[in-house]
């Protein structure tokens, strides 16, 4: 049996450039170090910060977080792979997270997942070839009273039918930064 070896790393920084920037280190030092008893306890906030900045956690960033927190790289990797919400490979512009809790299952989340899988021509955990969508299932979105629920990037959509989900997906703007919670009138915020 032959092993297929594929280098899945993506270089985001030029040689010598750090992904864990000085600004990020300062934020971790000032905001999180005082709140936690050890540097190890800052691993989760550090991983969240990296993922929020880049959309995923590159291998280089894992190594830099480990060095910054004075941990073994394996400890940081173990933490990142233990939790579902961390991404160690790039994902699509839109992360479609379908809740698979009991409440959502009873109310039709399986139909939503199956429909998205067929519509986007991907399996759960995969990204479309155009890198626009990544489809995943999560154990619970905490919206049992309004099931089924789907999280699109960071916007929660509740009581969804297949038709409503279709309309939602078809109306998503090309630029995910232009997408926001449709229930908020952004004009009143500014």
Regions picked out by a protein language model, each given a short descriptive name:
Residues 1-190:
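Signature of N-terminal electron-transfer/Fe-S-associated modules in redox systems
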